[in-house]
A protein has these predicted regions:
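Donor nucleotide-sugar binding/catalytic pocket of nucleotide-sugar-dependent glycosyltransferases
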Residues: 76, 88, 92-142, 146-147, ...
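Acidic donor-binding loop of glycosyltransferase active sites
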Residues: 103, 209, 225-243, 258
Length: 342
């Protein structure tokens, strides 16, 4: 993609150059390039790990290697397919065709796993997308926000998201800001609702308390998160994917020691309530958001740290990482056994 950053991961990576960057042509280009790459390198590959439904067809069509389907969301119930029956039917057809040909499937939480088990009658493992356990970021005052031009004279409510699509809650957070007197709202990320918020920075009703920061490297985002006063996760109902989602920002807030206000989506609300990490609201009306934010801010941030620290010890990558090796081993064995019976 044109805005892709240079790869800095610990393993070798190959980037595909696509002829289209959006719409149906993007997906068609992606499928072709993936399939062509697999054909060129098939002698070098032992197994294929597919992230989400839009990478699955070339791997399954290739047909010669074990395929692990890693579904990061309930793809066919995503917001982008709501109200688009033809597009959704295409993806559902692909999903049904591929499911019978997988070696293994994993997803990010038990709710989505249960939905797939009920739908296709197959085993689905759960590997949650949680951060590694590491020392908490040490921040000096609010310098991280000052570095991005955000004054630190008021408490800061933070919402972050790589892509703030419709109904991810950014619009609701902005609508609530006039009600949240004495609070600054910072949106970090990109997307449709981030763009709309950016266009309202000078609105009189925002009183100069709305701030938008473009997507940041993870280390910089961690510093901002640790420096904020309350985190917001306001996914809306109406899409099966959002209803069952377990967004990364929940764990980012947790590991940064940041109390949070969340909407009552199933997985998120259960964790926040059980571990006393903040406030859960049934709907993200301006008044409900304001009341919850003010309730969290009425307690010193230090008072939340015991429950946040305890949750961080329970929810981290070290808990689920061992499942990866087990899943790959099972997939390879199943593939070999299947080939021997043919």
């Amino acid at each position: 993609m044109p805005d892709s950053k240079p790869w800095q991961g610990p393993w070798k990576a190959h980037r595909l150059r696509l002829k289209a960057h959006r719409g149906p042509l993007f997906y068609a280009s992606l499928q072709w390039e993936l399939f062509a790459w697999l054909r060129r390198h098939e002698g070098e590959i032992d197994a294929i790990w597919c992230n989400d439904l839009d990478t699955l067809a070339p791997a399954v069509w290739h047909g010669k290697l074990p395929v692990v389907y890693d579904s990061h969301e309930y793809f066919t119930e995503a917001a982008g397919l709501t109200g688009r029956p033809l597009r959704r039917a295409v993806w559902l057809t692909l999903e049904r065709w591929a499911m019978r040909r997988l070696s293994c499937m994993i997803t990010v939480n038990e709710s989505i796993a249960a939905a797939y088990r009920n739908k296709y009658g197959r085993d689905v493992a759960v590997v949650r997308n949680m951060p590694r356990r590491q020392p908490r970021v040490c921040v000096k005052g609010r310098e991280a926000f000052l570095d991005h031009g955000v004054p630190t004279d008021l408490p800061i409510a933070l919402m972050q998201g790589a892509y703030m699509d419709r109904d991810r809650g950014a619009a609701q957070a902005v609508a609530a800001l006039p009600e949240m007197k004495g609070v600054r709202l910072v949106l970090v990320g990109a997307g449709v609702e981030w763009d709309e918020a950016s266009a309202r920075l000078d609105d009189l009703e925002m009183e100069g308390r709305l701030h938008c920061i473009s997507k940041l490297p993870f280390d910089q985002l961690r510093r901002l998160t640790a420096s904020a006063d309350v985190g917001l996760s306001l996914d809306q109902a109406g899409h099966g994917n959002y209803e069952m989602s377990l967004p990364n920002k929940l764990f980012d807030f947790m590991h940064a020691g940041l109390p949070m206000v969340v909407t009552a989506r199933k997985e998120v609300a259960a964790i926040v309530r059980e571990h006393e990490l903040g406030e859960v609201i049934e709907e993200a009306s301006p008044v409900a958001v304001r009341n919850a934010v003010m309730k969290v801010l009425s307690m010193p941030k230090s008072d939340w740290q015991a429950s946040l620290n305890a949750a961080s010890e329970q929810f981290h990558w070290g808990v689920d990482e061992p499942h990866i090796e087990r899943i790959l081993e099972q997939s390879l064995k199943a593939h070999l056994a299947d080939n021997q019976t043919k």
